[in-house]
C-alpha cells in the first residue's frame, strides 16, 4: 500500500508541540484509508514523502499544488521502494488535488515500474472544495 497524504507531507506550524503531542497533526484521510487497507490485506505500508514539505496552510498548499500541476513538476521523493519486485499487487492512495493526482504520486509512478502488477487506486476528495 503506497500512499501520498498531505498530513505526512506538511510542514508543522511553529506552535505545534510534537513532544507532548496535544497538537500533533492527526492522520489524514488517505493515511487512515491506507491503514485500513493494510489491516485488511496484511500488506506493507509505504508513505510517499517529498523532500520539500508542503505548507500546513491549506490555501498555500493548494497554490503550490496548482503551480506544480501547471509546470508538470515531479517533486523529489525522500525514498524509494527497494523491493517492489516482491509485490504482484499494489494499492495506491492519494488525495484528489486539482481534479487529479498530486504530482508526487506521478513522481512515484515514473520511478517505479508497475508493469504486470495488479494496481488498485483509492482517493479522497473531501478537502477539494474548501477554499
What is each PLM-predicted segment?
Residues 1-131:
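Active-site-proximal alpha-helix that buttresses catalytic centers in soluble enzyme cores
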Amino acid at each position: 500500500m503506497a500512499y501520498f497524504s498531505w498530513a505526512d507531507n506538511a510542514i508543522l506550524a511553529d506552535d505545534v508541540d510534537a513532544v507532548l503531542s496535544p497538537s500533533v497533526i492527526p492522520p489524514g484521510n488517505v493515511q487512515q484509508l491506507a491503514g485500513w487497507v493494510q489491516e485488511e490485506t496484511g500488506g506493507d505500508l509505504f508513505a510517499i514523502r517529498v523532500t520539500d514539505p508542503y505548507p500546513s496552510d491549506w490555501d498555500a498548499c493548494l497554490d503550490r499544488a496548482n503551480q506544480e500541476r501547471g509546470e508538470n513538476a515531479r517533486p523529489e521523493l525522500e525514498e524509494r521502494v527497494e523491493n517492489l519486485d516482491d509485490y504482484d499487487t499494489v494499492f495506491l492512495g492519494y488525495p484528489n488535488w486539482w481534479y487529479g493526482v498530486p504530482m508526487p504520486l506521478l513522481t512515484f509512478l515514473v520511478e517505479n515500474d508497475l508493469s504486470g502488477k495488479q494496481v488498485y487506486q483509492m482517493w479522497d476528495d473531501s478537502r477539494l472544495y474548501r477554499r
